[in-house]
Amino acid sequence: MLKELVLILMAGVLVNNYVLQQFLGICPFLGVSKKVNQAAGMGFAVTFVMLCATAVTYPLFTYALVPLKLEYLQTIVFILVIAALVQFVEIVLKKFIPALHKSLGVYLPLITTNCAVLGVTINNITDGYNFIESMISSLGVGLGFLLAMVLFAGVRSRIDNCPAPKAFKGIPITLIAASIVALAFYGFAGVVENLLA
């Protein structure tokens, strides 16, 4: 059981990284990754929302939607739960960490529409995970999002300080760098299974 939980966690962080392998959550990945501290703040906020969303949506789906045969409402119910959680996070950040709230700007409310958050809640159910496995999966996906954001912010800060051909400045060099980071994560595909075998 512990081995399976570690595998789920490592898969979420490295192998099935939602940003770099499944291309979910690209908007904040490209928009908030200019500074490492902003990227870390966004990564922690998204991880927190993912964990809270899973903690609420899993029992809601299992004990309310399924018994009432309302599974078709899954997406809309999950979006409403995520929106409420994001509002809660925004209120907490504004009250206790106003500098981070200001630096995240418009990207903080956009966590509501971050497809990575919705994706992890839906994928946990479609993958047949129980509650503990769903929470571990959400933690892994959130940490993977955080890792990708912070690594890419570091890469991006280096790119911004280096001369690049005029045609590559801005978005083109950013997308090229993102693809190289994604290729680096692709190298983890067989590592996790071999470590736990």
Map each language-model feature to its residues:
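Juxtamembrane transmembrane-helix termini in multi-pass membrane transport proteins
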Residues: 8-45
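Generic transmembrane alpha-helix signature in multi-pass membrane proteins
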Residues: 23-27, 31, 90-96, 107-110, ...
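C-terminal ends of transmembrane helices
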Residues: 24-38, 86-100, 152-163
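Interfacial loop-to-transmembrane junctions
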Residues: 157-176
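Structural signature of hydrophobic alpha-helical transmembrane segments
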Residues: 4-19, 68-84, 136-148
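Small-residue-rich segments of transmembrane alpha-helices in multi-pass membrane proteins
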Residues: 45-55, 105-120, 170-182
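Juxtamembrane boundary at the C-terminal end of a transmembrane helix
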Residues: 2-4, 183-197
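Ordered, amphipathic secondary-structure segments that act as subunit-interaction surfaces
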Residues: 59-105
